[in-house]
């Protein structure tokens, strides 16, 4: 699956947060996406994949042989969306612009 296809799949998940919740993640709906992401990470070859009790999906990519002593990097993001708008029944679309130009401005 291409990157754009993956992103469009992810935004189709209803991950609306609940500001009244005292749990992490704030809704069970967010766990659906987290578990989906964990399965994708496994399919992509990541190791030690897990979703922890606080709603973090984690996995590791082994170092390239010979580079095990190099610094590592981590990426983090959130899966919840605003409680102010419904996350249900989202139909994402892409719009391609083939010709964009900035208007000239004067100082």
Language-model-detected regions and their locations in the chain:
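Charged catalytic carboxylate motif
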Residues: 2, 32, 36, 98
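N-terminal capping segment at the start of a domain
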Residues: 2-28
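Charged/polar, solvent-exposed surface patches and flexible loops
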Residues: 5, 9-12, 39, 43, ...
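Conserved small/polar residues in nucleotide/adenosyl-binding loops
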Residues: 14, 98-105
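Short, acidic Gly/Pro/Ser/Thr-rich loop/turn segments
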Residues: 17-18, 66, 80-84
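A non-catalytic alpha/beta surface segment that caps or lines the substrate-entry region
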Residues: 22-70, 74-76
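Active-site cofactor/substrate anionic-group-binding motifs, chiefly glycine-
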Residues: 76-100
């Amino acid at each position: 699956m291409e990157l754009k296809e993956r992103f469009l799949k992810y935004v189709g998940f209803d991950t609306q947060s609940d500001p009244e919740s005292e749990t992490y993640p704030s809704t069970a709906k967010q766990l659906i996406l987290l578990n989906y992401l964990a399965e994708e990470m496994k399919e992509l070859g990541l190791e030690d994949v897990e979703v922890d009790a606080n709603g973090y999906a984690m996995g590791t990519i082994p170092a390239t042989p010979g580079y095990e002593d190099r610094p590592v990097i981590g990426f983090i993001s959130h899966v919840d969306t605003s409680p102010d708008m419904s996350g249900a029944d989202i139909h994402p679309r892409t719009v391609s612009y083939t010709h964009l130009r900035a208007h000239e401005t004067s100082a």
